[in-house]
A protein has these predicted regions:
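NAD(P)H dinucleotide-binding glycine-rich loop of Rossmann-like/cofactor-binding domains
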Residues: 94-172
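Cytochrome P450 core scaffold surrounding the K-helix E-X-X-R motif
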Residues: 42-48
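Glycine-rich beta-strand-centered segment in the early N-terminal region that forms part
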Residues: 23-37, 51-98, 135-137
């Protein structure tokens, strides 16, 4: 069996760079060659203290935000072929449980989860192939495409808030999600106030998100 390099999660604060078998795609699965992988805040938390939902059994793959190129497809896969540029969400709902029937898919009781983006290859399971594996548009880089899942959360949040031109929006906490939210709120025509503590992120709130006002919360600590 062919091998690959991968980062494996063994326990909180115990990750290892190892050589492991490449998992061949089964029926309805897709093998992707990783081109870009991000570090999510959840990855940092998982490294520090574990995650009972995202990683239920160790050792396991690690990392879940990625983009890449289809290397191989399993039997019955018709929507993707080797060479396709793709990005995937790290989960897919079952479509059958109490919450899915109410279209509250984020609360699905039987989520299919995917870890293992910190590797040369990742095998995307059937349900995620069917629901949340997407082709990357021409001209969009792998690095930017890998933001699809966190950006989708931001878009959903902006839609739920019903932001209108001229509204004033406060964003407290300007990590990647907060910065993207502030940027989209500006694109919706809102006046944006961004508040945080990190000097670099405060600068990004101005330069990237184009916030109208940036507040350094450290100035108000007692």
């Amino acid at each position: 069996m062919k091998k690959m390099k991968a980062i494996r999660n063994y326990a909180p604060q115990d990750i290892r760079y190892e050589e492991v078998d490449i998992q061949q795609p089964g029926d309805n699965e897709v093998l992707v060659r990783i081109q870009a992988a991000l570090t999510c805040g959840t990855d940092v938390k998982t490294f520090r203290r574990g995650h009972p939902v995202l990683i239920k059994k160790t050792p396991s793959g690690f990392g879940h935000e990625f983009a890449g190129i289809v290397e191989q497809v399993g039997n019955n896969v018709v929507d993707f072929k080797p060479g396709d540029r793709v990005v995937a969400a790290n989960s897919a709902p079952c479509g059958k449980c109490f919450y899915c029937l109410k279209k509250q898919y984020n609360l699905c009781e039987n989520l299919d989860l995917l870890n293992g983006a910190y590797a040369e290859f990742i095998t995307v399971p059937e349900r995620i192939v069917q629901k949340n594996l997407l082709k990357i548009p021409t001209g969009l880089s792998f690095e930017k495409a890998a933001f699809a899942e966190p950006l989708a959360n931001v878009v959903h949040g902006v839609e739920r808030t019903g932001i209108q031109p001229g509204d004033t929006v406060g964003v407290v906490g300007i990590g990647p999600i907060g910065l993207m939210f502030a940027r989209l709120a500006k694109l919706k025509g809102a006046n944006v106030i961004a508040a945080g503590r990190n000097p670099l992120k405060l600068k990004l709130a101005k330069d990237f998100a184009n916030a109208d006002e940036v507040i350094d919360l450290k100035k108000y600590q007692h």
